[in-house]
Amino acid sequence: MTVSRPYQTNTITHRKEIMMTTDQTTVASGDREEWLTRYYFTRAAFSAIWVAAALTAGSQSLAVAAALLIVYPAWDAAANLIDAGRNGGLANNRSQAINVAVSAVTTAAVIVALTMSMNWVLGVFGLWAIFSGLLQLGTAVRRWKTNGGQWAMILSGGQSAVAGAFFIAQAQMPEAPSIANIAGYAGLGAFYFLVSAVWRSVKQMRRKRA
């Protein structure tokens, strides 16, 4: 049986469209992979710089310490907003959408708490560490099948929640805490982001060489 030319042409065109769609999907997936790696490196770098500033200038100046304490949750809100936007938007990333809201509310709460005492500030950070940690854990679990290095994010989220409970307990002590109490928590976060970024970078390089 002879196949007509229009049918052959349509079949070839359809195959080309499928191949183009597949290629576009692969490129988009690769772009997201590279973005997430850069994102983790950026988060690690910011947290490391924040810790250094907190332990130096923040320990010498109350004004600098206050600014750093406000900036930290504000940055987390902005970072989650940008990351969600690069991965389908807030509607498709519910845990990050909630995290943006939680971090934004925390920023406002820190501003209010600074007018009271550092105990209040530490308590606010404790609640935030619990909620943001669990939300980070949820995001990592959701990304587990499609993105590498999420085991580090799961550990980070879990330890953040534990640290939050510890902060709340510390906040009730008579001794006034300082920004140094929070710097250790931020440093641990920087470590996990760096581990995840390096892990992903190594896997991506191996994949390109294969």
Would you name each region that the model predicts?
Residues V105-L155:
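Membrane-proximal helix-loop-helix units in multi-pass membrane proteins
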Residues F131-T146, A163-Q170, S196-R200:
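Alpha-helical transmembrane segments in multipass membrane proteins, preferentially the mid-helix core
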Residues L90-V102, G149-S156:
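Cytoplasmic-side transmembrane-helix entry/capping segments in multi-pass membrane proteins
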Residues P6-G89, M205-A210:
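N-terminal topogenic module of multi-pass integral membrane proteins
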Residues R43-W50, N99-T107, S156-A163:
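Core segments of transmembrane alpha-helices
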Residues V51, T107-M116, Q159-P177:
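Hydrophobic alpha-helical transmembrane segments in multi-pass integral membrane proteins
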Residues S61-A74, S117-I130, A183-G187:
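Structural signature of hydrophobic alpha-helical transmembrane segments
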Residues A180-S196:
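Small-residue-rich transmembrane alpha-helices that serve as helix-helix interface/gating elements
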